[in-house]
Design a protein with these regions (language model features):
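Cell-envelope and extracellular/periplasmic
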Residues: 1-248
Length: 248
């Protein structure tokens, strides 16, 4: 009942904000209406420079009504819901993910990087950046060369995000790729290779945690998670975050 209008005493009044970056499985492609909406008045999202009540789709990088891949349910809503319930604190989501993007498009100085920095700095006028959530890598899996160069690029990207956003210990939470992605996408063995790289990076990037996607179902398109799986994935992201900060 926490999110249904019941008054609670916050442990703290600070808004905790989280930057959402990556490609479509961070933005969210789950079908709207397949899962109950999350209604929690302590969860917010950045819209037009202001905190608005959280409502999906949170990261509308694509059309909501038209096209093959529509914006929809993602992992961030259940992440925010779990955070607010655990810590009795308001949460703000900063949606900056963009479907189909490669990590090269996120490098420091790129449009996507600069947009994420700008939106986060705007958000942190009225919040504290408490973490960066990243889900990306499918776009690299068509190329052995891109997979081989991924680790260095992500390591540098995390450093750049942190240096621009004022803290080298901002938690960085990232997720595996599904190894059930349909063969029609042409990713082959590189998905498993990428997950191996992620595992190594989780040991190399300080204050980071890797999230398993084992057992999560995919939509008929063979690459995006189902709405129910996004809900579970958001909980897994939160649990990874919670374990990480409990060690600090």
């Amino acid at each position: 009942m926490f999110g249904d209008g019941v008054d609670v005493k916050f442990v703290e009044n600070t808004m905790h904000s989280f930057l959402l970056v990556g490609q479509s499985n961070m933005a969210g492609r789950g079908d709207l209406g397949e899962v109950p909406p999350i209604r929690n008045r302590f969860c917010h999202m950045l819209r037009m420079g202001r905190w608005q009540p959280m409502s999906e789709p949170i990261n509308p990088d694509r059309s909501i009504t038209d096209g093959k891949f529509k914006s929809g349910i993602g992992l961030s809503a259940s992440f925010a819901d779990e955070f607010s319930k655990k810590y009795y604190a308001p949460v703000g989501l900063i949606p900056c993910a963009d479907g189909g993007t490669r990590i090269d498009e996120w490098e420091s100085g790129s449009l996507l990087f600069d947009h994420a920095i700008m939106m986060t700095k705007l958000a942190t006028r009225t919040s504290k950046l408490s973490g960066i959530l990243w889900h990306q890598g499918e776009s690299e899996c068509r190329s052995d060369e891109l997979v081989n160069s991924y680790a260095d690029k992500l390591f540098r990207l995390v450093e750049c995000f942190r240096s621009q956003l004022g803290g080298d210990d901002v938690p960085f939470i990232f997720g595996e790729l599904s190894e059930d992605i349909d063969d029609s996408w042409g990713l082959g063995k590189n998905v498993a290779r990428m997950n191996g790289i992620f595992k190594e990076l989780s040991q190399q990037i300080k204050c980071s945690a890797l999230v398993s996607v084992k057992g999560l179902g995919l939509k008929p398109d063979g690459i995006h998670f189902t709405s129910a799986s996004y809900r579970e994935l958001g909980i897994r992201y939160f649990n990874a975050y919670d374990r990480l900060i409990s060690k600090k």
